[in-house]
């Protein structure tokens, strides 16, 4: 859970530090047609910040989306275009993108027949999309999936890698161990579906879709060779919540420490009881005694 919150916080930081026309890590990207889904690419240049498959899945779901499913060749090409446009922007300009594969929402379901004879041959048919999509589109590299202990799927993104026996690795799919650390891509429902869901609710027919960051609606290009125009949506307001949540343990620690200090200070300032001394019991009396037996 904490790892997922750190991911969302990192994405929020990247979005808050970057505003530009290109595709930016942590920013929601939508096409001009509201019937098309939106995407969010989570790219971490620092390898130690990358996450395992199930952490990526949880991060997307907590943000209202799902780990990427790819329905057809057109969507595969669109994701490739987004990755080519990817940049991690800073105040001085875009930084270089290093090698790093991306988790997609395809994983192998281990059934009762996994150990039966011939199960290895049917292994590619055991892969399912985590968002419930029934699409059979696959973009495996030549000798993939290798199956075995590798049950989760990544999209190759290693621009510096040389082509292998099956051709270039870039954007092809590979099965990997689910605990490996990679980048990931989230996918969100089309805007028209979200509007329909809201309008179906009681009192939801007059839905105001205007926001502070209004999207620039553009007509999708008709030329297949032309790069698709993109719309960069504002960062999800829900991500801001996860900036506050991780600070709760720190606030509790400060509160406990403050209480402990106050308790110690009060203990030191408490007056101590002193034993009263009865002056009459002192062996030296201030009033001298008169010896009645002395005669002058």
UniProtKB/Swiss-Prot annotation:
Residue span(s) of domain C-type lectin: 38-187
Location of this chain's protein in the cell: Membrane
InterPro entries reported in the protein's UniProt record: C-type_lectin-like, C-type_lectin-like/link_sf, C-type_lectin_domain, CTDL_fold
Residues on Extracellular side: 21-238
Role: Plays a role in the development of the nervous system such as in neurite outgrowth and elongation. Involved in motor axon growth and guidance. Required for correct interactions of motor axons with the horizontal myoseptum.
Note: Overexpression partially rescues the motor axon defects upon Smn-depleted.
Protein name (record): Chondrolectin
Origin organism lineage: Eukaryota, Metazoa, Chordata, Craniata, Vertebrata
């Amino acid at each position: 859970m904490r790892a997922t919150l750190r991911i969302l916080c990192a994405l929020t930081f990247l979005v808050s530090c970057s505003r530009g026309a290109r595709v930016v890590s942590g920013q929601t990207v939508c096409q001009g047609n509201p019937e098309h889904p939106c995407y969010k690419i989570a790219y971490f240049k620092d390898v130690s910040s990358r996450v395992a498959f199930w952490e990526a899945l949880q991060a997307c779901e907590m943000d209202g989306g799902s780990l990427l499913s790819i329905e057809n060749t057109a969507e595969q090409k669109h994701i490739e275009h987004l990755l080519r446009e990817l940049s991690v922007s800073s105040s001085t300009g875009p930084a270089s993108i290093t090698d790093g594969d991306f988790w997609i929402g395809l994983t192998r379901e281990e059934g009762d027949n996994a150990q039966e004879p011939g199960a290895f041959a049917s292994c590619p048919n055991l892969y399912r999309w985590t968002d419930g999509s029934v699409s059979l589109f696959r973009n495996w590299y030549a000798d993939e999936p290798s199956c075995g202990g590798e049950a989760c799927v990544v999209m190759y993104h290693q621009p510096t890698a040389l082509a292998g026996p099956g051709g270039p690795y870039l954007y092809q799919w590979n099965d990997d161990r689910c605990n490996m650390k990679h980048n990931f891509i989230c996918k969100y429902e089309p805007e028209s579906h979200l509007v329909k869901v809201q309008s179906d609710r009681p009192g939801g027919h007059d839905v105001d879709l205007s926001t502070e960051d209004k999207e620039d609606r553009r007509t999708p290009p008709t030329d297949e060779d032309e790069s698709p125009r993109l719309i960069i949506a504002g960062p999800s307001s829900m991500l801001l919540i996860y900036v506050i949540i991780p600070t709760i343990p720190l606030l509790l620690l400060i509160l406990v420490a403050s209480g402990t200090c106050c308790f110690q200070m009060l203990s030191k300032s408490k007056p101590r009881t002193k034993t009263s001394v009865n002056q009459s019991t002192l062996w030296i009396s201030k009033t001298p005694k008169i010896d009645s037996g002395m005669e002058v």
